[in-house]
Structures are given as C-alpha cells and as structure tokens.
Amino acid sequence: MKTIIIDNLEWQEENDGNRRSLRDSIIYATTLGDGWRLPTIEELISIVDYNTYSPACKIDFCCPSHYWSSSLSASNSSLVWVINFCYGDVNFNYKDEHYYARCVRPIADVKNFKRR
C-alpha cells in the first residue's frame, strides 16, 4: 500500500476502490495493521483546498467523491460526518450509506511499527 505523510499523519495514498458502510469501513481500517483508523472530520477538512474543485484537495491522491470520517453527529448518533472531495463540502449521513474510506495513522505508530 502506498502512503503519504501529511501533518503528522500517515494517509493511504489511494482508496481501494470499494465503497462501504461505516461499520465495514472501520473493519477495513483494522485490517491494514498497526494504528490504522478512519480520520476525524477535522483531519479530512485539513486536506481540503477550497481554492479548487474536482478534486478540492491539497494533495494529488483525492478522488472527487464522498469519504467517511470517524466523527459522529453530536445531535444524532445514527449520523456520521462525511466529506465530498469534489467541492470540499461537509455534511452528515446515515451509517448504512456506502462511501469510500481513506485511512490514517499517527506518525508515532509508523515509527514504532516493526516489519515482520
């Protein structure tokens, strides 16, 4: 898997091409190994470039589509924040919708990772 380091996080460089429910996206992240998880909505927003669109992203690996965050809505725990990298818009949707997952892990986990 190709990755890129941005602001103390290691990001998947590309999604795997599969849209999943939130539950299945969380499971997918754990299959990647040590420390991998879904990003928070704040982490996803940090890579949005609002001066461009399709994709609205500061880096080249963003597909212009919806991606899951790990951030639940404060008013309704059935809803999760998602981001659309086509325009950088942020909203929430139900957990059973199917979106892409772009996983991250902290740099500390990368430094502590031992190849087997």
Where are these regions (language model features)?
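Extracellular structured ligand-interaction cores
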Residues: 65, 98-100
